[in-house]
Design a protein with these regions (language model features):
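A structural boundary/capping signal
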Residues: 1-231
Length: 231
């Protein structure tokens, strides 16, 4: 199957999406030439890119947060599928930050960049997940040809034995495709630690972050995007 044939199958009519612009940082017009490598190198760079640029969608992540893991995954998938166009990469593999993906949403991105975007949202929400690359039985079966995100139901230990959810922005159904082989890369942020030997600052002191402003901004954004998700 050619790149053009894949694009015909996976392209969709996307929504306007402008109501999310204020929730996503603008790209800084940076282009970094990375090493040449196989798909394993691609996934390793995807992991680095997500952990480097996840704050670009910190505000959006609060809008995509659901009441459960399932609802959160459904909202992320719905956003990716209906607000960002698909476009297969050629020989050159594009590893996009979420800001770059959003800027190019009408031209399209491929499965790697959908996965980076989903991973960035999940990292902001503190949700453990994996970037999964697979071999598909009916498409170049000897090669790893697709990548997406899986989210374990068990967020305590992050293991997949208790079941998991899939986030695949390339398809409307969001069902995991058949595969003959898989490789998973675990994604979770290491939390910052601060050693203290002083009184805990009281609320209202200079330097203490204001929760009122943040909650007001989040509430305003929620009102603007209300009704965008069918659940």
């Amino acid at each position: 199957m050619t790149k053009e044939e894949i694009n015909v199958i996976l392209k969709r009519r996307i929504k306007n999406g402008d109501e999310f612009n204020h929730l996503i940082e603008k790209p800084k017009n940076q282009k970094v030439k990375l090493q040449t490598g196989d798909t394993f190198y691609s996934v390793s760079i995807m992991s680095v890119w997500a952990k480097t640029f996840y704050k670009q969608v910190a505000k959006l992540s609060q809008i995509l947060k659901g009441k459960t893991i399932k609802e959160t995954c459904d909202k992320i998938h719905y956003f990716l599928f209906y607000d960002i166009q698909y476009q297969a990469d050629g020989v050159t593999q594009n590893i996009r930050s979420p800001a770059n993906s959003w800027f190019n949403r009408r031209e399209g991105i491929d499965c790697k960049s959908y996965s980076i975007f989903a991973s960035c949202v999940l990292l902001n929400l503190g949700i453990k997940h994996y970037i999964r690359q697979i071999k598909q039985p009916n498409f170049n079966p000897k090669q790893y040809t697709h990548v997406y995100v899986v989210v374990p139901n068990n967020q305590t230990n992050g293991k997949l034995e208790d079941g998991y959810r899939v986030i695949d922005g390339t398809v409307q159904s969001n069902k995991e495709p058949n595969y003959t082989s898989k490789k998973d890369v675990f994604m979770s942020l290491k939390l910052p630690h601060i050693g203290l030997n002083c009184p805990v600052p009281k609320k209202g002191l200079k330097g203490t972050p204001s929760k009122t402003k943040r909650s007001t901004t989040t509430k305003k954004s929620s009102n603007q995007t209300r009704g965008r998700f069918p659940f």
